């Protein structure tokens, strides 16, 4: 079982191979990054609970959606105990269910690009800014409902690599990016 009340740096590698669900769309996670709140200059929560980052301060097991470059909706899972800020950015994954919905949202792109990169992930899932702060249910046994955000843990921990995050300008050396090596849905370096 994944415990989202743990810090993001502990949760992130456990998410590889897990499936995030929103409605009928399911995406197997292949790349994630941790952001550690007040201790991480690259985190939106670094300056405290601003209106944008307030949801990162808990409670855990909620979605944090933000707009990147004014157009990309990026999805994070809020972690850590209530009052402490950390979140895992969902950077890449493989669409395993709801292909028609994901394809309608993403257009005519290669299958491995449907949810490759955090903005594409948010688009494939159909995430909206209004959903920021909505709860995430952790499910098992393949049971899904048509509503809400759900996280289905991987049947086993995936082999992974760890290294620096990508696309940031602060705290760039923190090794808080995890990915499944050689997976074509990983957006950053794959080796």
UniProtKB/Swiss-Prot annotation:
Protein name: Putative 3-methyladenine DNA glycosylase
Keywords in alphabetical order: DNA damage, DNA repair, Hydrolase
Pfam families membership: Pur_DNA_glyco
Source organism of the structure: Cutibacterium acnes (strain DSM 16379 / KPA171202) (Propionibacterium acnes)
Gene3D superfamilies, alphabetized: Methylpurine-DNA glycosylase (MPG) (3.10.300.10)
Family, similarity comment: Belongs to the DNA glycosylase MPG family.
SUPFAM superfamilies per record: FMT C-terminal domain-like (SSF50486)
Lineage: Bacteria, Bacillati, Actinomycetota, Actinomycetes, Propionibacteriales
Origin superkingdom: Bacteria
GO biological process: base-excision repair
Molecular function via GO: alkylbase DNA N-glycosylase activity; DNA binding
Enzyme Commission number(s): 3.2.2.-
Top class in the EC scheme: hydrolase
């Amino acid at each position: 079982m994944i415990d989202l009340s743990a810090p993001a740096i502990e949760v992130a590698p456990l998410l590889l191979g897990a499936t995030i669900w929103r409605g009928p769309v399911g995406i197997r996670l292949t790349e994630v990054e941790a952001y550690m709140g007040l201790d991480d200059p690259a985190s939106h929560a670094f300056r405290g609970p601003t209106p944008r980052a307030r949801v990162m301060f808990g409670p855990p097991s909620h979605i944090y959606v933000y707009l990147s470059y004014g157009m990309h909706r990026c999805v994070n899972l809020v972690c850590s105990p209530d009052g402490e800020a950390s979140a895992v950015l969902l950077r890449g994954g493989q669409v395993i269910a709801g292909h028609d919905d994901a394809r309608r949202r993403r257009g005519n792109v290669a299958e491995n690009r449907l949810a490759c990169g955090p903005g594409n992930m948010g688009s494939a899932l159909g995430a909206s800014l209004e959903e920021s702060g909505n709860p995430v249910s952790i499910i098992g046994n393949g049971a899904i409902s048509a509503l809400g955000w759900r996280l289905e843990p991987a049947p086993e921990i995936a082999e992974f690599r760890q290294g620096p995050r990508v696309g940031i300008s602060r705290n760039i050396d923190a090794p808080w990016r995890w990915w499944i090596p050689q997976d074509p849905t990983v957006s950053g370096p794959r080796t």
